[in-house]
Regions:
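A structural signal for short, well-ordered beta-strand segments and their strand-loop junctions
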Residues: 8, 48-53, 103, 128-131, ...
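C-terminal catalytic/acceptor-binding lobe
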Residues: 1, 26-27, 168, 173-253
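Conserved catalytic core of nucleotide-sugar-dependent glycosyltransferases
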Residues: 109-179
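Active-site nucleotide-sugar/metal-binding loop of Leloir-type enzymes
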Residues: 86-100
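Short, solvent-exposed loop/turn segments at secondary-structure junctions
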Residues: 12-14, 56-59, 79-80, 106-109, ...
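N-terminal anchoring/stem segment of glycosyltransferases
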Residues: 1-78, 91-95
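A short, glycine-/small-residue-rich helix N-cap motif at loop->alpha-helix starts
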Residues: 77-85
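Short beta-strand-to-loop acidic/aromatic patch adjacent to the donor-nucleotide binding site
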Residues: 97-109
Length: 253
């Protein structure tokens, strides 16, 4: 059954990016609970999701995702390659032009109602929507246009991370740009490869392909150095109806 939003959620058994010195998790962070939060806050009448799981470092069978049904297995080992493979998977689905595609990384926490808020963002006729209120662009001298929808204020932002939403037609039109900044990603050492997402959205903006984000955010990157402001995300996590609390799973990151 067709749903308005198709989510492609990238997971992996282990990410070497967690070894970088600037990658710090909040004290409340837990990958299993973040996934449960995602499932329990989406509107199932609006959203389908596909897990794109990278088994380069280990099998999905060793994780809390072992019983998930809609899974695409890849073996990449780096953020750049997994993003490029996810783009291939999306293209293979041959969606309608107006299908909303949400490319989501596995360390984003959501507030209830995010599905509806995402649709409000697209009602503003923006090419790209992020639910993450990236604090990098606060008090930084950036001028922006602001908007309002029934549930939120919005602002135009210069860039965002590789978690974003757009329509399928937009993704295809901009595909070469998305590919370029992952093919030519940041490569600090073997498998420490990650996309130049910031640079990518700057180029898209120059082509008048703008991205907007809500204020405050309806999601946050679970990076202790860049949490979406205003919202108590620890409270959001604790309010999640987390099932299987007593089960033990292995996940190496």
């Amino acid at each position: 059954m067709k749903k308005t939003i198709e989510v492609f959620l990238r997971h992996c058994y282990y990410s070497k990016l967690q070894e970088l010195p600037d990658r710090t998790r909040p004290s409340w962070f837990n990958k299993h609970r973040v996934f449960e939060n995602f499932k329990n806050t989406l509107n199932s009448e609006l959203v389908n999701y596909t897990i794109v799981y990278d088994e380069f470092y280990g099998s999905i069978d060793k994780t809390f995702l072992a019983q998930e049904k809609n899974v695409e297995i890849i073996r990449c080992g780096s953020e750049c390659d997994s993003f490029l493979k996810t783009l291939d998977i999306i293209q293979s689905r041959n969606f309608d032009d107006d299908q909303i595609i949400y490319l989501l990384e596995d360390d984003y926490l959501h507030r209830s109602g995010w599905s509806e808020v995402m649709l409000e963002g697209f009602a503003l006729d923006s090419k790209y929507v992020t639910l993450y209120d990236f604090d990098f662009f606060i008090n930084a001298g950036f001028l922006c246009e602001t908007f309002v929808t029934p549930s939120s204020h919005w602002r135009a932002v210069p860039a965002t991370t590789n978690t974003f939403a757009c329509k399928y037609k937009t993704l295809l039109e901009d595909l070469e740009i998305h590919q370029k900044y992952s093919i030519d990603g940041i490569k600090e050492e073997e498998l420490f490869h990650f996309s130049r997402d910031y640079d990518k959205f700057w180029e898209l903006q120059k082509n008048q392909r703008y991205v907007i984000s809500p204020m405050p955010g309806w999601s946050t990157h679970c990076d202790a150095n860049h949490i979406s402001p205003v919202i108590d995300w620890n409270k959001v996590m604790n309010e999640t109806n987390f099932k299987n609390e007593g089960k033990k799973f292995t996940l190496k990151y």
